[in-house]
């Protein structure tokens, strides 16, 4: 992960070695946060491009951390459901 833009209300991050999967779920969770004004990602080239996630919020770092924690919690819940089968 490399931060390429870090301003008070904006942040852009490159996720090396990742694909749509991680960025799309993070974007979705970020947009559930009322403090997030915008969240989007792009991949310049489908084969060799690295995803870039853009966040505009009151505190993008706090919003990203909260989104990551929410994702972890949802993954833990999913794992428990699968294990209970």
Swiss-Prot record:
Q: Does the keyword Flavoprotein apply?
A: no
Which UniProt key words apply to this protein? Answer: Cytoplasm, DNA-directed RNA polymerase, Nucleotidyltransferase, Transcription, Transferase
Q: Which CDD domains does this UniProt record tie to the protein? A: RNAP_L
Mind telling me which Pfam families this protein's record contains? RNA_pol_L_2 (PF13656)
Where mainly found?
Answer: cytoplasm
One example of the protein's molecular function in GO is: DNA-directed RNA polymerase activity
What are its GO biological-process terms? DNA-templated transcription
- GO annotations of cellular component type: cytoplasm; DNA-directed RNA polymerase complex
**InterPro entries (alphabetical):** RBP11-like, RBP11-like_dimer, RNA_pol_Rpb11_13-16kDa_CS, Rpo11-like
- Quaternary arrangement and interactors, per the entry? Part of the RNA polymerase complex.
Q: Which NCBIfam families match?
A: PRK01146.2-4
What is this protein identified as? DNA-directed RNA polymerase subunit Rpo11
Which organism does this record belong to? Methanothermobacter thermautotrophicus (strain ATCC 29096 / DSM 1053 / JCM 10044 / NBRC 100330 / Delta H) (Methanobacterium thermoautotrophicum)
């Amino acid at each position: 992960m490399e931060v390429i833009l870090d301003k008070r209300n904006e942040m852009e991050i490159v996720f090396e070695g990742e694909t749509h999967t991680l960025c799309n779920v993070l974007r979705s969770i970020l947009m559930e946060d009322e403090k997030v004004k915008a969240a989007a990602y792009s991949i310049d080239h489908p084969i060799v491009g690295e995803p870039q996630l853009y966040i505009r919020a009151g505190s993008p770092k706090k919003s990203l951390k909260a989104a990551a924690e929410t994702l972890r919690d949802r993954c833990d819940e999913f794992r428990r459901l699968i294990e209970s089968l």
